[in-house]
């Protein structure tokens, strides 16, 4: 994960000071890309410990099309608590848009199911896209999507995925996003009888919050460790049938965690 540390160092030393919605302040750069060859290990940050349970359960929650944090709370995941309303709801965020995008004539489009079908039937298509950025429903979302659009690409029997992320909280959020979409790529590859290829991350506003700078400096002093390997239950052939126990990361070596406040 040297590429991640390189981005962090670049923003730390060359980022432009900017104000932001939360009132915290950031150092920011605009436009950056990282590529991860999934055959060389699973791209999870090793220079601090990540809460893998949260990453896995959040992705399964997205895939279910849910927008209420009850499932997350039941599984010990609190990363969405600050944005939920008194009933635990977040509005039509990621999972709703992925699985139930509303159309003008009142229908609902399951973008993920459509992409899975097209990957199997038309792998060379250039239309394997899923978007969470529904302009008409942004006002009803607890938080507009930071990771907004992803596209799959098939070549020589390998599935790659590129994510466009409009806003990237480098210290806290980005390690989760990279691991989550790398996991999704592995899962989609398995159910489509493909091998994992690359995960390409493209960021818009890439920033470090000013109250994360000390933590970033500490992390930048640490040496990356070897990447772990992802193991999926090979019997799962339906993307929406994966459960937590079907997913395992083997050999995850990491440095100690580094705590930092969330900007809300």
From Swiss-Prot:
An annotated GO BP: dTMP biosynthetic process
Keyword S-adenosyl-L-methionine: no
Alphabetically ordered keywords of this record: Cytoplasm, Methyltransferase, Nucleotide biosynthesis, Transferase
Reaction catalysed by this enzyme: dUMP + (6R)-5,10-methylene-5,6,7,8-tetrahydrofolate = 7,8-dihydrofolate + dTMP
Binding residues annotated for dUMP, in chain numbering: 21, 126-127, 166-169, 177, 207-209
GO cellular component: cytosol
Ligand binding ((6R)-5,10-methylene-5,6,7,8-tetrahydrofolate): 51, 169, 263
Pathway membership, UniProt: Pyrimidine metabolism; dTTP biosynthesis
CDD domains reported in the protein's UniProt record: TS_Pyrimidine_HMase
Subcellular location: Cytoplasm
Signal sequence annotation: none
Family membership noted in the UniProt record: Belongs to the thymidylate synthase family. Bacterial-type ThyA subfamily.
Matches recorded under HAMAP family: Thymidy_synth_bact
NCBIfam families: PRK01827.1-3 (NF002497), PRK01827.1-5 (NF002499), thym_sym (TIGR03284)
Protein name: Thymidylate synthase
Organism of provenance: Alkalilimnicola ehrlichii (strain ATCC BAA-1101 / DSM 17681 / MLHE-1)
